[in-house]
Amino acid sequence: MKVVLLIDHFGAGGAQRQMAGLACLLKERGVDVSVYTYFSYNFYVEQLKQSGVPYEVVKGAESHWRRFFYLRKKLLAAQPDWVVAYLDTPCIMASLVNWLGGKFRLIVSERNTTQTLTRRERLKFWLYRNADYIVPNSYSQGDFVCKHFPQHKAKTVVIPNFVDLDKFACATERHRQQPAVILVVASIWASKNTKGFIDAVRLLRQHRNDFVVKWFGRDLRSTIPKNTAYAQECQRKIKEYGLEDTVFLYPKTKQIAEEYRKADYFCLPSFYEGTPNVLCEAMASSLPVICSRVCDNPKYVFEGENGFLFDPYDVKDMAAKLDEALQLSEALHAGYGRCSRAIAEEKMSEQVFVDRYLSLLRAPHDGQAE
């Protein structure tokens, strides 16, 4: 069985992390797998090389206007049995190639939760008619697809993200530091609610100062004006509120596993998510979680067991839940961490993830997944 994985690039994104992992796991299972991209960001490329996964940036496809033609030529020449595409544009490109001469079977993967049904979204789901499977990485997106496009219900199969349970692990029982470290791992974008989180920290600091926040997510290479402007606004807020000694914004890092081990809590204040990689990693690292009550988060974070949920639009609610978390006794803090790890082991293992993909790849034509 020959499988081609298609994605835009291998920069430091969640979808890229999952596709790199999928490629390596399929290779370990003996699948003839290769990966194509059309931009040359290489954050995860070393991982592919170490596993012996062939990787190629399709020359010419970086051009918006020529992308389809170069990708079509490449995919037709490769003659794969399957193409697995992640993210909207690669999924659209693979669907078009499949319509226009492609003999391969196709899995398209939805990596976020759709907020608005635009014309582009409707076109994308129309093109999915010929896909063998639609694989959302969250149950909330799976529900969305089945509700708005019921004709796709039979071939929609949710496969949540996996986490490396060996890499993301805390070898010893957690003992909370003073001040406590609240870790956030997310891009500094409007959808991640950085400004709202800073406002919540300002409220919390009015009556306690026994914590610091380490937010890893600054993109020093960003050329997108709105993202750069948003990050600058966040820095101004921190200075205006006098939080320079409390909230620290750091660049993205490949050594994030060590940061999880050094933290006491994990927080994710996003307005929406799919199944966040960083939530999986934090839970595998035995951290209590404080996150927004959106999408799939309540499927993994249970109040009174391993974390706290808040309304991301309500700054006071966010501050209150951060406060509750900081008030946990040492015994409860450690217990929440153990519970997070147990949930990760049950629901987020590499084996569960790759087995679900293999059940699709091995399914007979017009057959349903196991």
Predicted regions and their residues:
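Aromatic "clamp/platform" in nucleotide-sugar-dependent glycosyltransferases that forms part
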Residues: K252, F271
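A short, active-site helix/loop in glycosyltransferases that binds the activated sugar's phosphate group
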Residues: A131-T156, V163-K167
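Conserved acidic donor-binding segment of nucleotide-sugar-dependent glycosyltransferases
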Residues: E303-G304, F308-V315, E324-E330
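Short hydrophobic beta-strand element within catalytic cores of glycosyltransferases
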Residues: P288-C291, V301
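Conserved donor-binding/catalytic core segment of Leloir-type glycosyltransferases
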Residues: V4, R174-K192, F197-V201, V213-K214
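Acidic anion/phosphate-binding donor-loop and adjacent secondary structure
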Residues: S63, C146-K147, P160-Q178
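Short His-centered aromatic/hydrophobic patch
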Residues: A85-C91, E110
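Nucleotide-activated donor-binding/catalytic signature segment of Leloir-type glycosyltransferases, i.e.
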Residues: T228-P251
